[in-house]
Each structure stands twice: as C-alpha cells, then as structure tokens.
C-alpha cells in the first residue's frame, strides 16, 4: 500500500535519536555516562599517554564555579577522604537548528511522490491539457542522457551477470535508504492482511470436513449442523472456482469462514424460535465448531520452517536488519555480499550516510542547473511552458529533501539556532577555479536566493560550545583495602562510587586529592595526604589506571598510588577531536600544535575549532562552508606557506577560493580519521585518497580494509558510483516489479498491497532519488495488470488508488504538487487505461469465476466503481450513466453465454444434443432436468453473492438472467420435442423451473416464464384429459366387477401405512410417470406398496373404508388435484380454469359412484325377501356400499371445494345427492332388520286370547315358557349390531342408525301391546317380550345410545305393561312362574358364559325367599288390577267376560 503519510520527515529511532513523532524539532544534549569499575591489583602502575596541553593551571584556580565533594573511606591506616574537583560552567550556550515559528515543522508534499491518500482522490480538478508534444525517452530528471546502451549479451551467462550487477547496484541504493531514512516511515495504519490458503492446505481442510462428516472426529453436532457442513463441503469446498481462487492467492481462512457464516445465518434465521435458546447462541456455537474443524489441531503451525515464520512477520513494523534481509531475498543478494557492502558503505555510520545524502543532493542540484541551461536534457512535455515548471519542481523537491535532512537532530541545542538551513546564505559554493573540474560544490536552499557574500551569517564562538559528561571513579589506594564510600557530603557533584560532572571544556583539568580525617572535635580542616591531576579527553583510556600522587614533603610516606577511572564522553555533535599542527592564512596563522574539535552545528553546518585547557569557547574557529579537504605532501605544505613546517609527519589541507589551511599529525591512522571526518563535513564529491608512499605496515583504518575487500569481490564500482548518473526511474521500475513478485508469493493474501516495510523503502527510494509519482504509479499499474491478466487476484481498490492518482496528474490536478506532465506519462496512461478497461470488462463478464462466492469481499463492487472511473474522459466530467450501463449490459450479456456454456458442458447436454453418439430421449430429459437444477443454483448464488454489488444495475442483472434462461430454452425445446407423445417425465422440469421463477419477483411472468407456460400448457391439458378419461373408464369397469369388499380403513388407522401412502402420493404428484402408463387413451395410476402389516393390524383387516373401485377413484381424484395444485401454475386465469375443471370432474365422478353404489344396494335389498328369520345378518357387501356413500361424503368436501370454500357450488349439489342416497340406504337397512321383529311378533300373536292355536299350544305345553323365541330375537339384533359396528367405518352414522333402529323396535312393540290392551297376554308372550325389552335396553346402551333416547315414553309404556302382565301371570299361573327365578339365574349364567342356547338346560326348584317376594309383588299388582276392573263399571266387566276367558 502506498501510505499517504510516508513523506513525513521522520527517521528510524536507532539511526537518528530524539526525533519527534510529529516532525517537531527538539534540542537534545547527548552525554550519558557509562562507567566500567575495575578493581586493579596493587602495585601495577599504568602511565597515561594523553598529550598534555600547555596549561597546567590548578582546577581550583579557575574563575568558573567548581564544586568539591568529599568522600569518606575507611581503611587500616585511618580515616582518609578523597576529593575530586570538577569544572562546570555557569552558562552553556546551546546551538539550535532552525525551528518554525509555531513549533511544528510542516513539510509540504510537493516533489515527494511517496504515495496517495483519500484527500488526493477528492482534490479539486484543474483544467485538462489538450495540447501534446512528442513522447520523451524518460521521465527521470537526470542530467546524463543515458543514451549509451550496452549491446545485449549473446550468452545466457553474460545476461545473468548483467542482471546480477544491476540487482547489486540497486541493492546499494536500497541499503542506503534503509540505513538512513529521512523522508518516509513505516505506516502503522495499513489493513492487516490474512494468511492465504495454499492448494495443499485446501486439500487438508477438505479432508478435515470429510472426516467430520464421516463421524471420525470428537465434535458433537446435531443434524442441522451436519446438513450445513455437508452443504458447505459439497457446494463450496469441492467447487472448481474455489480451487482457482486458492491458486490465485486470494483466499484466506477468513474468506472460508465468512462464506460458511453467511450460509448458516440464512439457515438459522429461517428456523422456528426455540424457548430458552436464542438464534445468536446457535450461530456462535456453530461457528465455534466450524473453527475447530477448519483449523484442526494446530500442529502444522509448530512445524513451520523458520524462513516461513520470518515471512509471516512481514506485516509488522520491521527492523533495519529485517528490511535488509527482505530486500536481499527480493534482489537475490547473497549474505556475504550484503556484509561486504554494509562495511564498505559504512551503513552503520550516520555521519557517513548523511554526508552521502548531502553529496547526492548537491549533485542533483548541479544537474538541474545544467538542465536549465541545456533544455535538450529535459524530457518532452505536453506543453512547452512546462519546461520551466519542471525545473522549479526539481529545485523545490531537492530543497524539500534538504529541509527533511536538516530537520533530523544532530545534538541538543542546534535546532533553534539562527544558523539553521533556511538562514544559511552560502554553504560550500566558493570553489577555487582550478578545482572546479575535480570537485563539485554542495548546493543549499539559499543558493537559489543569491550568492552574496555580504548576506552570509558567520558562526560565533558561542555557537560551537560543547557539553561533556565527565566521570571520575576512585578505585583503591595501594597497600590498603579497597575503598568504599559510606556517606556523601557535597551537593554537586554527588559522589557515590563515582563523581559525575557536566562541563563545557573540551580540555578539562580534574584534580583528585586525598585527605585524612582529623579526629579532633574543634578541628577545622582535614590533613591532605596527596593529590593527582588528570587531563582527560574523549579519546583517553576509559579503563582504571594507577596514578602516583603528589605528596607533601612533610609526610613520611612519599609513595602513594591511587587507581582512578576517568571518562570524558563524546557529544553527538562533536565529530572528531585531537591534537594537530595547523597553519592558515586567515586563522591559525602560526604553525603550532593545538587541540582541535570538529563540531556539527546542524546537518549542513560544520566548524573546525581549536581549544585551550579549561576554556569552553574556542580560541579560534573556521566554518567549513565551501572547503575541500585532501591529503598533501609535506613539501607541498612548505611550498604553499613558504616556510619550513616542523612537527607532524602526515599532512592534509582544507582549501577554498581565497583561503587554505594545512594540518599535520604524527599518526597515520589519526590523519585518515581527520580527513574522513572533514570529507563528510564539507560535502565534496571528490573522495580523498591516501598517498601511496605511506608505510604499508602502518595500521590502516577499517575503512580502507573494507574498501580493499569490496575491490577484491568486484564491488568497488557499485560503491563508488555516483547515484546522480543513474536513471532511477528505470531502476525503480525493476525494484517495484521484483518487490511485487515477492509480495504475491509470500504467505499473505495481499491482493497486490505492499507490506509496511516495502511501502517504507519504496517511498524513501522515490523521495531520495527523485522518481516521479505518476511514473511510479504507472509502473505499478502496469505490474498489477500483468499479474491480473495472469489470473492473480488484485484488489480493484488498489488499482483505483493508483489510477486515480495518474488520472489526476495527467489532467493537471497536481495530486503530489507536480504540475509538469511528460509526453511519455500521457501516452503510458492512455495505454494503461485501455488495458484496464479490457481487464475490467473481462472480470465483469466472468464475475462468477473472477470473484467466486463474492470473495474477496467487496471486490466486485469496487470493480464496478473502478469501471466508472476508467470510463471518465477527464477528472472533472462524470461519465454518462448510460455509457456505464451499456458497458455493463454488454458484459453481462456475454456473461450469460459464458455461464450457460460452462454449465451445459458440466451437465453434458451439448454431448447429448450435438454429439456423435445417439443418446436416448429419456437420458436427454434426465440431463436437462439436472441442468435446470444447476441453472437454478447458479442464479440463486448470483443473487446471494453478487446482488448487492449490482444493486445499482439490478435491471441489468435481471436481463442477464433472462438471456441465460433464453439459452436454456433453446436446449429445453429441442429435448422436449424429441420426447415420445403422452409421456409425462417432463413435469418435474416444469416444477423445478416454475418453483424458482414464481418466487423471484424480477423473473416472475418474465419472458422465459411466459415461454415455460406456453410450452407446458398443452401438456397439462392433455394430461388432464387423459386422466379424466381414465377415471371414467375405471368407474365403469370397476363397478361392473366390484365384489364390494371393504378397502382402506386399515390404511387410514395405521400410522405407518398412512405415512407411506402420503409419500406415495407426493411421489406420484411430483413424477406423473410413476402413476401413468404410456397408453394413449388410458391412464393407470401407480398404487403405492403398503408396508408389511403386523399381526394386530392384520386382525383388524375387515375394518375398511369403502370398496376397491371407490378407493381407487377418490385416490386418483385427490392425486390429480394435488399434482395440478403443486404445479403452482403462474397464469391465474388458466389456474382457475384447471381448478374449476378438476372440481367439476370430481363432482361428476362422485355422482356416478353414488349412482352405481345405490343401484347395487337396492338389488341387494331385494335378495332373501321370501324368508326372513332371526338367523339373518346384514351382508358385508351392503355395509361396504354404505361405507362408499359415507366416504364419498367425506371426500367430496375436499375434492369439490377450494380451500374449504364452495366457490363453484359443486359441493352443495353433490352433498345433496349423497344425503339422499344415505337416507335411502339407512331406511333400507332398518326396514330389513325390522322385518325380523315383525316376524317374531307375528309368531307371538298365535297366543292371543281366543286363538285356537294358542289354546292348543297351551294345553299341550309345547311352547314351554316362550323365552326361546325372545332369546332368538335378542341373538339376532346382537349379531347385526356387531356386524354394523364392525363393517361400517363411520361411528356417527352407526350411532345414528342404532338410535333409529332402537326407536323403531320400541315403537313396534308398543303398538303391538297397544292392540292387546284389553286382553291379558299369554305367559309365553309375556316371557318373550319381557326378555326382549330388557336385553334391547341394555345392549343398545352399550352401543352408545343415550339415556334420553333409550328411556322414551314408548319404552316406559312397554315396560309398565310388561310389569303388569308379569304380575298377573304370577297370580294366575304360579306353576309356570315358579321357573322364573331359575330362568333369571340361568340367564345370568348365560350372560357370564356367553352361551346363547338355553333349550337343553334342566329346570331347577324355586327358592323359598324368592317365591315369597314374588308372591307379594304379584298380590299388589293383582289388587291394583281388580280395582281397575271394578272402576270400569259393569259394562267393562261384561265386555271382559263376554269377549272370552283367560282359561
């Protein structure tokens, strides 16, 4: 990612300390003290080799403030005190760099093409440039034309060697950017990238999910989660598109997780609410289980190699070592090559790197000057006026780099000085004319303002005051114990085990005195035992050394030695120090040895100062502006000043126009260090080379050794080359391309975004070496498009950023402050724009395969947004919406063909229709149905995963679907045309398509939906016609052969069978081919196979629901209506027509069924009319007929109404016919049964008074008691009650029938008794009717007849009459009645034993108590009867007597 904030002036903390995070200039003083305390052995004396200056003044004698601290130590001799005296200055003048008035350094972004931001994309747009000029060769602002191009090597080895050299040279520039950055920083606000999934990891993940589905894991899951995982595995993980997404490097575990989460969210949301369990809890639980399956045990992470682990850290903020390592891998630089370059370039030296930057910037400024004079060196611009603008922009960019460099702090106190970069009028521009061919002056910001010497500001002595940290540690006294401090008495410096001083003296004098404590109470001072004077410098030894103390002459012990460690730290702004011989024309006019310090006031200001002991200000100083340093011979120095310079062996000088200074020292290494330090300070391009005459055995510096090592390995040219001579734009193009290749191959799904470390280095390179921002982004776009065209997944948002930057620049909007536009940039942009347009068109056309399952998230939406941006003519005028729509419409039309072609190939429909092998028609239809399912899935996925992205173009997505279906319609019509006539295997195809289309608001009643209706409407009509004919034939033939066996109740009562029947009906409705045969004029239903019945089910097999023909009829009618209803015919008018026709058909068929059943019932009623006895039982056939009528009544409501509403009044009509048939059958059955009672009563009538037959029967005692006749009738109605209850399914009808039958029987008995109200009944009549009355009441009560129906007035009258008759019999015929108790007992036994025959049971003797009770009851009845007779009068009595006698 190109970070918008990468141009801020911030450096690495370890390279440049104390840099404010917001670019604020801070004043720091470096002087921390770190001391090593070493206990030395007694007697060892180490001498000091520190050169001593001429001043030996005692520290106490200094007029500046001094503090004396006393440290009390104990040893065997007595109490000894050691005092150290440190010099401090009252006031330290701090040297500060330039500070902005507000305290914050605001750095403009002009000229630093380090990135783009959101503000860049939203900037106001200037007018576009219409003119154009010829295309230049390069946009790089380099002076050299780079026209020399080496001929292409002919051998592979030579080409590889050239490429290796190019990469090493590039690595040299990169390593300098890493070691000392001053423009960019590593961004911390970039989006964290997820680790991508490789092909091998995809296989492992798939295996984990397969193991879960097989139950091989320990993860507990319910069936719903199992189904969700199964769907995820089949649809997503096994998809070819997911494999391609993995191969493109765009998929991460986050993507896999999000796809599953989106799927289960829809599933869980559709589930019903469960009390106590929220759907959020279910989602969380499912996602936790999914994560366990997806990530496995985690053992793979522990086995990851270290190199891969290092790559995984690339998303973090990287250290310099990690950045070096990363770009070694990018540029294929070996480790030892890096080490050689690191040492030779002195990458660990901030001074050397800052000096190199100053030389580079000076060189670039000179090239700008040459370009200004020679316009042919410039690239060609679209407008001639841009040449001057280009020069100003180059100067501005260089000045900005200088400002960035100047903003880096050197040490405390230099940022607020009036000698900051902005106020320096001249710096190193005064070059002697004889050196101009060799040396290069160093440019500065003020050079553009003028070269007036008068306006230059000179340094004062206060500006170069240094601050030193001084540490003094007293270790031990010889021949005594090691000293320990146990109290401190002085305030400053505070002594503990050491004394810390702050001083501004480069040459301080430290005096340490040893005292013995005076034990006297009134003693004023301690006795001095000895003292030692130290003169430390920053170059002095830091280790403890023994010193001989100066002892007063009056002490007996004249040899006291003390071990002291004295350390003087070197401030950061002191670059070098030491003793030199010097002579100059304006300063140091006398040749003598002085103590010199090279002071850095700011990044561009250095001073050479000489100091005396105990002085904080320099005695003399020289500002190094414009000087050039180099080695010289002693003879040259003598000749230059005309005197014999005695002292010093190794000479060097600093020269500028009108001035020259010579220096000398006694050590060769010291001479080299001074020259290198001054070389960095002057900023000269010429690097001094030591004279060859120097002693080879002398200890040369490490720098020279590193240079020799680099020369040995052939890297000297890479190190010493001038960066200004390179075309950095071309080098950067290579660097960016290699970095992108490395990034796309790292473990992260970067989508082309660079890591923070890569962004930082690229930003720093562009800023430091002047790579134009537009060129950078154009190269980036070209590289990204190359990868995208090779099926790498590149984030369209990233392309959008770079494209918007380039478009803004080309149209003159200055996103980075650069207004000049080269001809090459404009042409390159046009080329990129066309390539990008073609790529976007391809991606939108193949959106399902470029963005599988809508991943990466938001990519398609960003692609459409980018397309709109690309189609804009300029940055101001928005593109017409119709143009964007036309482009997307064209792409989606092509996408429909692409998607359908791939699906049809997958379903092999092309092979079926256009292949060489002849495929049977059913196989073609099967493949077509499979293709339809795939098409529905595809369009549902489009809506689910891509609908949101196409929200602004939803109508185009609908049109895409219509075109897609139109392609399918061509194959569908061809396959259907090849099917045999009157086959119904194609109805599942209609249901699949129609069920999808009718639920889609956009496609419902669309073009394809209308075509589907038109195609299948004739098939539906033909199917209904054939079904109607088939049902009519089945009724006609079925009733002719009907055996009237009950069917269906068992299936209705058995839940297992009911479930199976429901499944069979659903199957039949969904696939009519299973229920219809292929005959042209006859259609037979497929009868589902019922499950095997259990014993208990088989025992109730007689309980049925109708006959075979009626069951078949009702099942067919219901299946046909269900099938047509489940078609969900989209056309409301045709759907209503079908409904009306099917309801009318049902009415007609049921009516025929009723008529045929009623006709058969009437014929059965006429059978056995001649002989009706108590042995008669209703035939099961008649019961079956009743069941048919009852079932017809139940079925008619469902078959003739629409959702329970009698819309067409069909139900009322058929229900009336059913009721009539039902009434007729009920009457027929009851009449048949009542004829038996009538026959029984006619037999009992033979015993009437005055009947000859009755008298004979009574006299002969043939009739016994008459009970057998009554018992026979009881057996009759019991048997028929069981028959009706067992054979007729409707319990309500049965109850109603029993109530009616009971009422008819009671009424008939009542009428029969009423006819004999004036006559006494024969005891046989009494016995029979009394038995019937008792049993009929109890038995019908058991069948569910209610009390109010049973205990009717007729029954009460009969019961009362029979009680009277029984009493009369008991009085008049006691012998006959004596057997009654026995009969009652026997009847009870018969009830218990279930025995219906009583004729062979012997009579028993009466019980005395029962007889007595019976006699009392009879007496009462007779008394009442006699009273009744008397009350009727004489006429009544005479009529009784006259009509016959009981005897």
Curated annotation (Swiss-Prot):
Ranges of Low complexity composition bias in the record: 127-144
Start-end of Basic and acidic residues biased regions: 145-163
GO MF, any single term: calcium ion binding
SUPFAM superfamilies: PH domain-like
Pfam families xrefs: C2_CAPS (PF25341), MUN (PF06292), PH (PF00169)
Keywords: Calcium, Cytoplasmic vesicle, Exocytosis, Lipid-binding, Membrane, Metal-binding, Protein transport, Synapse, Transport
One Gene Ontology cellular component annotation held by this UniProt entry: synapse
PH domain boundaries: 573-683
Domain C2 positions: 417-547
Sequence ranges assigned to domain MHD1 in this UniProt record: 970-1157
Top-level taxon of origin: Eukaryota
Acidic residues compositional bias, start-end: 1-15, 1386-1395
InterPro entries, sorted: C2_dom (IPR000008), CAPS (IPR033227), MUN_dom (IPR010439), Munc13_1 (IPR014770), PH-like_dom_sf (IPR011993), PH_domain (IPR001849)
Location of this chain's protein in the cell: Cytoplasmic vesicle membrane; Synapse
Mutant lacking the gene: phenotype: Flies display locomotory deficits and complete embryonic lethality. The mutant NMJ reveals a 50% loss in evoked glutamatergic transmission, and an accumulation of synaptic vesicles at active zones. They also display a 3-fold accumulation of DCVs in synaptic terminals.
Predominant cellular place of this UniProt entry's protein: membrane
GO process terms (BP): dense core granule exocytosis; exocytosis; neurotransmitter secretion; positive regulation of calcium ion-dependent exocytosis; protein transport; synaptic transmission, glutamatergic; synaptic vesicle exocytosis; vesicle-mediated transport
Region (Disordered): 1-35, 101-163, 1386-1406
Composition skew (Polar residues), residue ranges: 18-32, 111-126
Tissue: Restricted to the nervous system at all stages of development and highly localized at synapses (at protein level).
PANTHER family: CALCIUM-DEPENDENT SECRETION ACTIVATOR
Domain notes for this protein: The PH domain is essential for regulated exocytosis and binds phospholipids.
Protein role: Calcium-binding protein involved in exocytosis of vesicles filled with neurotransmitters and neuropeptides. May specifically mediate the Ca(2+)-dependent exocytosis of large dense-core vesicles (DCVs) and other dense-core vesicles. However, it probably also participates in small clear synaptic vesicles (SVs) exocytosis and it is unclear whether its function is related to Ca(2+) triggering.
Protein name listed in UniProt: Calcium-dependent secretion activator
Organism, as annotated: Drosophila melanogaster
Lineage: Eukaryota, Metazoa, Ecdysozoa, Arthropoda, Hexapoda
Protein's gene: Cadps
